[in-house]
Curated annotation (Swiss-Prot):
GO terms (BP aspect): lipoprotein localization to outer membrane; protein localization to outer membrane
CDD domains: ABC_MJ0796_LolCDE_FtsE (cd03255)
Binding site for ATP: G60, A61, S62, G63, S64, G65, K66, S67
SMART domains: AAA
Molecular function GO terms recorded: ATP binding; ATP hydrolysis activity; transmembrane transporter activity
Protein name: Lipoprotein-releasing system ATP-binding protein LolD
Known role: Part of the ABC transporter complex LolCDE involved in the translocation of mature outer membrane-directed lipoproteins, from the inner membrane to the periplasmic chaperone, LolA. Responsible for the formation of the LolA-lipoprotein complex in an ATP-dependent manner.
Keyword annotations from UniProtKB, A to Z: ATP-binding, Cell inner membrane, Cell membrane, Membrane, Nucleotide-binding, Translocase, Transport
Subcellular locations according to the entry: Cell inner membrane
The gene coding this protein: lolD
Family stated for the protein in its record: Belongs to the ABC transporter superfamily. Lipoprotein translocase (TC 3.A.1.125) family.
Length: 249
């Protein structure tokens, strides 16, 4: 059974099961910017719900507001109207410190560029989120090493980013996002800088980790083939989110 057939089977099994808890919800999200003296509405009454272990793709034209939506979902940007809840807790009802603590505990982030610290090894880059949470260096490295093993890079733990390939660097970034065992990972064009075969491998890895760790993924992508491998697809057009029917892969 090849990777894509396996993914489709797992997606169908996931969708056919009982409804699972929502880990991330957004209701009535509107986002407006001032540009050239005019109000520009990027998001218009967007509704999003992400269930435990679900893989959700967000697609749309360049400049349609996909990254803005991801930043709002992650609590990195505030909506002009509407509400985002993470693990049932609305961001607007939390003090800034509580919101930051919740985000750091329950969310992971992966970007198109890996944002690894060049002077640190892969192991120490992955351990960094745990060290920020005041975990001891020994324990943080233990968990980081386990996560690197899960992304197939245990043998590269002592290498710095400059000594790794593009695909390896992105796998380290994925390990870093998952090392805190978040409920949901927000990924903004995570394969955008990779060649076709490497992108396919990294995307399959994310879907497999979502299944084994029961972690939700919200993935912004321009690639329709990759999006089709997720459980659901939302298209952002003119500020409005539309759910698209699943297409067999």
């Amino acid at each position: 059974m090849n990777d894509r057939v396996f993914e489709q089977t797992m997606n169908q099994n996931h969708q056919g099961g009982a409804a699972r808890e929502c880990v991330l919800e957004a209701h009535g999200i509107t986002k407006t910017f001032m540009q050239g003296g005019f109000n520009v509405q990027v998001l218009d009454n967007a509704q999003v719900s992400v269930r435990r272990g679900e893989k959700l793709a967000i697609v749309g034209a360049s400049g349609s507001g996909k990254s803005t939506l991801l930043h709002v979902l992650g609590g990195l940007d505030e909506p002009s109207a509407g509400q985002v809840s993470l693990l049932g807790k609305p961001f607007t009802q939390l003090a800034e410190r509580e919101r930051n603590d919740l985000r750091n505990r329950a969310l992971g982030f992966v970007y198109q560029f890996h944002h690894l610290l060049p002077e640190f090894t892969a192991l120490d880059n992955v351990a960094m989120p745990l060290r920020i949470r005041r975990m001891s260096a020994e324990e943080a490295r233990h968990h980081a090493r386990e996560m690197l093993e899960q992304v197939g890079l245990g043998a590269r733990a002592k290498h710095r980013p400059g000594e790794l390939s593009g695909g390896e660097r992105q796998r380290v970034a994925i390990a870093r996002a998952l090392v805190t065992k978040p409920a949901c990972v927000l990924a903004d064009e995570p394969t955008g800088n990779l060649d076709g075969s490497t992108a396919d491998h990294v995307f399959h890895l994310m879907l497999e980790l979502s299944r084994t760790l029961d972690t939700s993924f919200v993935i912004v992508t321009h690639d329709p083939d990759l999006a089709a491998r997720c459980d659901r697809i939302l298209r952002l057009r003119d500020g409005v989110l539309h759910e698209e029917p699943a297409v067999p892969v």
